[in-house]
Amino acid sequence: MSSSMSTLRNQFLIAMPHLKDPNFEGTISYICDHNDEGAMGIVINRPLDIRLSDMLAQLELGGEGIAMPVYSGGPVQIERGFVLHSPLGDWQSSIEIAPDICITTSKDILEAMARGVGPDRTLVALGYAGWGAGQLEKEISNNFWITCPADSAIIFRTPDSEKVVSALGRVGIDYHRLSSISGHA
């Protein structure tokens, strides 16, 4: 991470309209970690054709009737589960990213969710988005991404189809006016 760019932890990363990478076209990611070694985020607007109840059943945890979607969190380690949630709770592998947003990777949170005693707000994803040292900074300087402050309401309560527009609207940007052609002034 260059000294000119502060951490992007607890920020949204929004794909510019000209970014045509199928893994990220039209996405909004929540950045969970960002340091000199790289960055890690979860795509929060790409639901898969699997419900949480299906995933919990595959893990033999029960949870029948939980209609919540499971998301494609990104192209890295797509077999690994990540739960963004609020509040923190007492799970084995949790990291507080912001006062109202945590990430957990341990099975105990899924067990609690199956029993109906999990966190109040959750987003379950398979896989994550990862960038090596300096890679994300270079992509941002090449106008592939817009960053803006994260908001837990957008992660947990905004419909998927509205997340990008809502996040950009919070900082005064109209997504529909963004150019699909990149460049530098």
Curated annotation (Swiss-Prot):
Protein name per the record? UPF0301 protein HCH_00550
Its source organism is Hahella chejuensis (strain KCTC 2396)
A Pfam short name: DUF179
Q: Identify the NCBIfam families for this entry.
A: PRK00228.1-1
| UniProt cross-references to SUPFAM superfamilies, sorted A to Z | VC0467-like
Top-level division of the source organism's lineage: Bacteria
> Its family?
Belongs to the UPF0301 (AlgH) family.
GO CC terms in record: cytosol
